[in-house]
A protein has these predicted regions:
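Phosphate-binding/switch region of NTP-binding enzymes
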Residues: 66-67, 71-132, 140-141
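Phosphate-binding/switch loop-helix module in NTP-utilizing enzymes
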Residues: 1-62
Length: 141
């Protein structure tokens, strides 16, 4: 079970309060906020509400100097909404699994929506609890 979670996902205000309270505890530190997954939280809401909430949330986090990594599961939210949301971020990271089903590999592509440039070829990667994302060939994936 996750340490921080929302039992009732039908309230963006509850999420905002939880996130704000959590971040206040680290106000004097550099913070990297990882939310997995925002797409499931946003399912019950309409397009305008999702976009307004997300735009305001990211603006507030940037003002506080907080680096956000938000995970969105592909295919959960409307494609148009995801395209617009993608423009709210400086960098987008696409993660997926590839290779044989018997031994799948984690793959990553990094890009900027505004320039339309993504890595042409996905790279293998691993995730370390100490160092974060480690690109192959530096790690066994």
């Amino acid at each position: 079970r996750e340490r921080h979670f929302i039992a009732n996902q039908y309230s963006l205000e509850k999420y905002a309060v939880l996130e704000s309270n959590l971040l206040e505890r680290f106000a004097d530190q550099r913070v990297r906020l990882v939310v997995d997954s925002l797409s499931t939280l946003l399912i019950p809401f309409g397009q305008e509400e999702v976009l307004e909430f997300h735009r305001n949330r990211l603006k507030s986090l940037r003002k506080k100097g907080i680096l956000a990594l938000d995970v969105f599961v592909d295919g959960v939210l409307d494609r148009r909404v995801m395209t617009i949301i993608g423009h709210f971020y400086n960098v987008n990271v696409r993660m997926k699994f590839g290779g044989p089903k018997a031994r799948p590999e984690r793959l990553i592509q990094v890009g900027k929506v505004k320039s339309g440039k993504f890595d042409a070829v996905p790279r293998r990667f691993g995730i370390s609890p100490i160092f974060g994302i480690i690109f192959a060939p530096d790690v066994e994936v």
